[in-house]
Amino acid sequence: MRLVFAGTPLAAVPSLQRLAASGHEVALVVTRADAPLGRKRVLTPSPVAAEAERLGIPTLRVNRLDDDATARIAAVGAELGVIVAYGGLVREPLLSTPARGWINLHFSLLPRWRGAAPVQRSIMAGERVTGASVFQLERGMDTGPVFSMEERPTGDHETAGHVLDALAVQGADLLARTVDAIGAGTAVARPQEGEPTLAPKTTIDDGRVDWARSADEVLARIRGVTPEPGAHTSVDDVRLKIHRAAALRDAAPLEPGRIAALDGRVAIGTASHPVELIQVQPAGKSPMPAADWWRGVTTKDVIAR
């Protein structure tokens, strides 16, 4: 089949690579416009745009799928549109422009975690299993019938970044098999079953750790917002980012937010057992071992808030 592919971040690159290597033709790649990155704000193509260039596939770099973009996509004459984290809404008439419509690879077990941050929200909620779904795009947000779905267990220490990297590869294979089935006329899409949950985009506020929660909830929050937007707390009114932490289940309890050295480890209290801070990043500095940071803290009688 002749395809048009829409995607933007690194998580969409394995899907583009997999489809480009298949028996189908990726005639056009739609991605977000080049954006300023880094301290020097250099205009930089999206990871998908860069990969499309490497593969020699024409790109359409737009932030809105308006009438002009619709006309340019329609001119390609694709039979099927494929979306993986493009970052914009597909509305009519574009929704009906490819003969077979659009399918979307979503990184959750639909209808759970519909929205922009399914992996992050799943981990933050303490779930032990996530996965990927390929569904027919329709007007509702991630509501369309599902062609295929695969589960993936979430490890106790995996961050959202780790899980998303793994699902990007697993999902790419699932997506390619689904495209093959659609092309062969054997694909069957079934309505979503179960109670839907929503996964809105994460914000800086989502990264603030509430030490009055249990250790398990605290650690789930930290893993769910790592690497972005990142977990953080305030110590003496100075923001401290938390990159890695672990449970200290056998340690003596500490007041929620209280920081102390326990057997050479930097511990912080929660509503249950303490949590060990392993790697942190003080404001304006590079990431460092928590023990190094703690040695530089002059006032040891502190509570994180």
UniProtKB/Swiss-Prot annotation:
CDD domains: FMT_core_Met-tRNA-FMT_N, Met_tRNA_FMT_C. Gene3D superfamilies: 3.40.50.12230. Keywords: Protein biosynthesis, Transferase. The keyword Transit peptide does not apply. It catalyses: L-methionyl-tRNA(fMet) + (6R)-10-formyltetrahydrofolate = N-formyl-L-methionyl-tRNA(fMet) + (6S)-5,6,7,8-tetrahydrofolate + H(+). Its EC number is 2.1.2.9. (6S)-5,6,7,8-tetrahydrofolate binds at S108, L109, L110, P111. GO terms for cellular component: cytosol. GO terms for molecular function: methionyl-tRNA formyltransferase activity. The keyword Lipoprotein does not apply. It holds the Pfam family Formyl_trans_N. Belongs to the Fmt family. Attaches a formyl group to the free amino group of methionyl-tRNA(fMet). The formyl group appears to play a dual role in the initiator identity of N-formylmethionyl-tRNA by promoting its recognition by IF2 and preventing the misappropriation of this tRNA by the elongation apparatus. This is Methionyl-tRNA formyltransferase. It comes from Clavibacter sepedonicus.
